[in-house]
Amino acid sequence: MAGGRGAAGRGPAEPQESYSQRQDHELQALEAIYGSDFQDLRPDARGRVREPPEINLVLYPQGLAGEEVYVQVELRVKCPPTYPDVVPEIELKNTKGLSNESVNLLKSHLEELAKKQCGEVMIFELAHHVQSFLSEHNKPPPKSFHEEMLERQAQEKQQRLLEARQKEEQEQREILHEIQKRKEEIKEEKKRKEMAKQERLEITSLTNQDHASKRDPAGHRAAAFLHGGSPDFVGNGKARAHSSGRSRRERQYSVCSGEASPGSCDILYFCVGSADQLMVHKGKCVGSDEQLGKVVYNALETATGSFVLLYEWVLQWQKKMGPCLTSQEKEKIDKCKKQIQGAETEFSSLVKLSHPNIVRYFAMNSREEKDSIVVDILAEHISGISLAAHLSHSGPVPMHQLRKYTAQLLAGLDYLHRNSVVHKVLSTASVLVDAEGTVKITDYSISKRLADICKEDVFEQTRVRFSDSALPYKTGKKGDVWRLGLLLLSLSQGQECEEYPVTIPSDLPADFQDFLKKCVCLDDKERWSPQQLLKHSFINPQPKMPLVEQSPEDSGGQDYIETIIPSNQLPSAAFFTETQRQFSRYFIEFEELQLLGKGAFGAVIKVQNKLDGCCYAVKRIPINPASRQFRRIKGEVTLLSRLHHENIVRYYNAWIERHERPAVPGTPPPDYIPQAQNSSATGGKASGDTEELGSVEAAAPPPILSSSVEWSTSAERSNSARFPVTGQDSSSDEEDEDERDGVFSQSFLPASDSDSDIIFDNEDENSKSQNQDEDCNEKDSRHEIEPSVTTEAVHYLYIQMEYCEKSTLRDTIDQGLFRDTSRLWRLFREILDGLAYIHEKGMIHRDLKPVNIFLDSDDHVKIGDFGLATDHLAFNAEGKQDDQAGDHVIKSDPSGHLTGMVGTALYVSPEVQGSTKSAYNQKVDLFSLGIILFEMSYHPMVTASERIFVLNQLRDPTSPKFPDDFEDGEHTKQKSVISWLLNHDPAKRPTAMELLKSELLPPPQMEESELHEVLHHTLANTDGKAYRTMMSQLFCQHSSPAIDYTYDSDILKGNFLIRTAKIQQLVCETIVRVFKRHGAVQLCTPLLLPRNRQIYEHNEAALFMDHSGMLVMLPFDLRVPFARYVARNNILNLKRYCIERVFRPRKLDRFHPKELLECAFDIVTSTANSSLPTAETIYTIYEVIQEFPALQERNYSIYLNHTMLLKAILLHCGIPEDKLSQVYVILYDAVTEKLTRREVEAKFCNLSLSSNSLCRLYKFIEQKGDLQDLTPTINSLIKQKTGIAQLVKYSLKDLEEVVGLLKKLGVKLQVSINLGLVYKVQQHNGIIFQFLAFSKRRQRVVPEILAAGGRYDLLIPKFRGPQALGPVPTAVGVSIAIDKIFAAVLNMGEPVTVSSCDLLVVSAGQMSMSRAINLTQKLWTAGITAEIMYDWSQSQEELQEYCRHHEITYVALVSDKEGSHVKVKSFEKERQTEKRVLESDLVDHVMQKLRTKVGDERNFRDASDNLAVQTLKGSFSNASGLFEIHGTTVVPTVSVISPEKLSASTRRRHEIQVQTRLQTTLANLHQKSSEIEILAVDLPKETILQFLSLEWDADEQAFNTTVKQLLSRLPKQRYLKLVCDEIYNIKVEKKVSVLFLYSYRDDYYRILF
């Protein structure tokens, strides 16, 4: 085209040539641009005769192609010869997607453009314009109605699918949430039971100590026990256990922000052992340790539902991983990875450590992510706080508590050092204290190693804050002792020790100073080891002889308080001496239970009144009597005393006490009194002198009540027995005085004439009291034996308040109050009622917020914490109180005002917040209430920033701005009330009374009493319409999918194993065979029974309601339903057995009752005077035990007792007959270890039993032994009253008969008489018995009851009808805990082979299936259990795996290729054989194989039984007297170390092999048993000889050198290293004199040393 423009400028000499050239050039360009869309329409375009251009262009929208093109046009251009000076003909053809109007418009545009372009080539410009036009009009064609309908239907379907998917996902989330919630509930329940059990164990140990050591010089027991203290110990201990919980754990670390969202829950997997895996749900972040670079998370181990802690190190690479790394950087990265691998190797040894004073490690895992390496460690979950947190909150630790901590720290540290583990970073942050006060050491060894890896320069250093302490870092075990000394010094001083060299304060006790010197001395050689420190006098102080003999009453107080609550948690425990306690009203009248909260003002303590047994909250405030703050406090306490309303926390009493405590040198306290430089051991004072106010320094303390305490409430209720306190100074006269004086008691204060000063003395009286006190102090100081210690006088104001047990409104809001609208409005109305009452009394709360609104145990509101409340009095223009007003109350009105600026920023009203000089009235509380109502109505806000933002939006001056998700129809009323309350103009804000009367509030709910009355009447008329309506509504309730899923989630855990089901079937079949040998038949009774309170008086059954409202119960046992069945069917002779489920109710709601499988065997006979049924029943259980080797190993004993003998003993001990049933319950709980001895004594005390009766009772019930040995004790009862003698004679006769019959039947178990055996005495009469063994669980020996039963003749008549006649049969029954037999068989060392069938028939193809079916039918007919494989397409490996999983020994392979033969494969003893058998001979062949297999198993079982019998007698004891030296049996320790895991029977076989081989050699050794050890290994004789080259007597380095040399010469280095480590442990740690190394492979041994 450029050429064309050039040609136009040429002269007229050659016009024809220039036109043709320009036309040709343009055509060439167009063909190149449009390609196949270009078409030359001239017939002879290449001919010699030149014709003007005529072309056709197919055009589309510009830049589009394919499915996006909806329009198209063909542009046809015919040029004249003189083109481009003459306009060409333009035509549009074959248009698509354009209307006629659009085509005409386009054509007119083209014609205009052609005229403008005349003289220039224009076809390309025309084509470009067409493309632009098409782009503008490129629209899809309009759809038909049908197409639109289909599209709409598709969209609706897609929307429905999306909604269904969202609903399904929501249900899944709810189910997962419910599962997590249930797991937490189950875990908390387990935790509660475990803590209660631990509490009982601790109390048992304390009881033993009391019996051994708590004696005064006169030989009497401690006063706390004499005064009925034991029940309180137990009850309050439980309350402590409940109230600790996980909240303390969460306070252990600083709150972690930014690490993980609270809702995140990752799943992590940890390898444990060779193949096992732990699946752990990672919970929220609970803290971080910058020093060690770790983050701590709560986690849940899914297999057991146990809570664990997850320690996580995230090692962030400085540079992204990739090919750009240098070789030096790659070397550093490889080095770090090897270091982490080394840490994992070290961790494998740490997992084995277990000690009460260290936190256990469970598993470790490291994983590489995109830009980091993440290391996770699972550790034991401890419910407690770290000593660092304790240090920051509570200050110095009292010395007696510090001594306890030190002993436990040393025990844990010594255990680590004995196992060659160095802690490396021992500090207050790495020591935890759980809810029971037990110290646990964590972060040992591995944490320091991982922290050091974090320091590598290939990692970012932002996550770790390395120590900048001036203290030197000391390594090794002595370094741990150094850090222990620093830790203890920090605890004693209340702050971290940072100075070097360490200076030990001289005011510490001398023994503690010496202890610290032994820890922090600079020379490592002089520093003591933990073993030496455990023997230090600070840990084991010498008992001091008292100067004055102390009475039991005096000695009991301190112990009593300390037993209830750790003294380090109560501010008073460290400072109040015993003498001060004796004259303190607080300690005389109250018993401290729990610290509820602390703040700048002092502390709030939960106490129990010793007289009425009720719990109260006591606020203890240190005060300065000479300060202005003290006068303000007096006025506020006076105001609070006037409040008495059901929605206001009640203030009962208030008084002041003066105490003296040791002064801290150099730092006098705020209320320090210079005159009080007397001894802390003040002499006795009269109770009336407790209030002594003296002159104090002019400087007043900081404002005490400037902020309110955030209360930590407790939901538990003390179940302690209440006893009147004796030996105290309080009397009934003082109690009467308290009642007369009203709320504020004056029993400890002189009378006051001032109306305003209800409690306090005037100045003259104060000074007089002080002078008297000084005189007394001077007089007492002359009699001091030791030099006086500097003390300071402290005055405390005690305010006794109502204790709210449940929670605060903040807790309720966070738990989702917004979901329960009715409860929300009820609580809001109660808050309004309380506020209206306060305002009516002329007061303003001024600090109203959710944490200051409490809920009691009945879920009623209690407004409390009036620390900022003030009297609503009129102020004059100068801001001073009107003197004429006095103490009178002026009613509030809109013009009333007060001055001040206090409160919490988010809740305070604008008039208070705006200016310090602003005046306000009672409506400031209504503004706060508006914020509170919004929080009650809105979902809990997750983060603090969200809460601040939302609440600040509500406080907008124009109008409240609600969140978007609050703008719906459900919150219309709430929005109206909130908007009214949050009006920034106080005049437009309602009063509490106006709002109560407003129609915006829903009507008040029906009073509970009225509701109860209606329900009572409804339930009383079971035929009425109201009753039917109520039942109908009850049974119309809908269960959500989450509830449906979690109802039985603990039963259906998804871990079904076919082997377990087969074991259960095998056990049941074995037991049934025993029963059938005695002629018993299976008989199952009806499942449900009507509720019967008398039968299950003590045991709680699972109750349900049928559609008519009748209460029925699932069977608690199988005995009662059978007795009912026998009575209703007049059965006189029957032997029956039954294996059925029994049920226990769950304490958690919406859970399936707990199912237990029980086996019952009963004999019913019309013979009344025979003991043979009882003996046969016992013998039957003996036979069951003999059927299972796993039960034979447990050495069961048979305990017998007689209900008449038990009754005779109780009557002989002076227990009235009307209290026997209660005593039976107590004794039953004691036998089943539900109660400790102390709790038993407490319950007996409640029955008003004398101490003599208890002593005599214990004398009898603790007796157990052979009948022959106990006969004299039993005969001593015959000399008593006639009734008792007859009971004893009858019971003794029965016992003698049963014992004799058992001997005749050949029962070889030990038969003992247990006079304390109590088993369902209400159901039985006659002989009762138990089969009991003792097993070790968790380092404790616990009784395990396999079976229990007895004679129950008197139970049957209780179920007979009123018209029933005829004799009553005799019945004896026994119940077997069959689940314990299942567990015993499953856990056997030698696994039991259980197969569902004898032979598996497999078809090799579809064609052979009919032959396989016929063959299976023949096997079934012959009585052979066979199974046919349905899926014939499985491979050989899959078939073999199926047989292994189902423990199938024989397989018959049917194939057409084999003709009339069948391949029989057998998988026996890890070897596979194959044989071709004729199809007709298959049945006989299989039966022969099965007979051979049964014979082999019988022989093996007999051999195992003999082996078990030998083992029971002792591994190294025999009848011939071998191994006996000087009359003492030598029983050396045998350890079997195998490269593979051995079963128990195999291990026992090796032990007996050692016994036989070495018995002569051992008999000739003159050594004690503890000096000999045998190590049995799986090594050849040549390797045993190589061990003689090891250097045993050299040091550790030389020994390791010889070990390396040995390993370099031999294979199996890992196994050899394990053997060498065990030998070294025996030599060095155990210090054994003689060691035999025995090869059970070659039956060869050598003595190594």
From Swiss-Prot:
InterPro entries: aa-tRNA-synth_II/BPL/LPL, Anticodon-bd_dom_sf, CC_SR_Kinase, Gcn2, HisRS-like_core, HisRS-related_dom, Kinase-like_dom_sf, Prot_kinase_dom
RWD domain residues: 25-137
Binding-site list for ATP: L596, G597, K598, G599, A600, F601, G602, A603, V604, K619
Listed EC numbers: 2.7.11.1
Region (Histidyl-tRNA synthetase-like): 1022-1493
Active site, renumbered: D847 (proton acceptor)
Location in the cell: Cytoplasm
Enzyme class (EC, first level): transferase
Catalysed reactions listed for this entry: L-seryl-[protein] + ATP = O-phospho-L-seryl-[protein] + ADP + H(+); L-threonyl-[protein] + ATP = O-phospho-L-threonyl-[protein] + ADP + H(+)
Residues in coiled coil: 146-205
Biased composition (Acidic residues): 731-740, 754-764
PTM comment: Autophosphorylated; autophosphorylation on Thr-899 is increased upon amino acid starvation and in UV irradiation cells and inhibited in presence of IMPACT.
UniProt cross-references to CDD domains, sorted A to Z: PK_eIF2AK_GCN2_rpt1, RWD_GCN2, STKc_EIF2AK4_GCN2_rpt2
GO BP annotations listed: cellular response to amino acid starvation; cellular response to cold; cellular response to starvation; cellular response to UV; DNA damage checkpoint signaling; endoplasmic reticulum unfolded protein response; GCN2-mediated signaling; learning
Disordered: annotated span: 1-26, 227-260, 662-785
Taxonomic superkingdom: Eukaryota
Xref: Gene3D superfamilies: Anticodon-binding domain, Bira Bifunctional Protein, Domain 2, Phosphorylase Kinase, domain 1, Transferase(Phosphotransferase) domain 1, Ubiquitin Conjugating Enzyme
Keywords: Acetylation, Activator, ATP-binding, Cell cycle, Coiled coil, Cytoplasm, Differentiation, Growth arrest, Kinase, Neurogenesis, Nucleotide-binding, Phosphoprotein, RNA-binding, Serine/threonine-protein kinase, Stress response, Transferase, Translation regulation, tRNA-binding
Function, as annotated: Metabolic-stress sensing protein kinase that phosphorylates the alpha subunit of eukaryotic translation initiation factor 2 (EIF2S1/eIF-2-alpha) in response to low amino acid availability. Plays a role as an activator of the integrated stress response (ISR) required for adaptation to amino acid starvation.
Domain notes: The histidyl-tRNA synthetase-like region and protein kinase domains are necessary for eIF-2-alpha kinase activity and eIF-2-alpha-mediated translational control. The histidyl-tRNA synthetase-like domain is necessary for binding to uncharged tRNAs. Kinase domain 1 is a degenerate kinase domain.
Family: Belongs to the protein kinase superfamily. Ser/Thr protein kinase family. GCN2 subfamily.
Designated name of the protein: eIF-2-alpha kinase GCN2
Gene: Eif2ak4
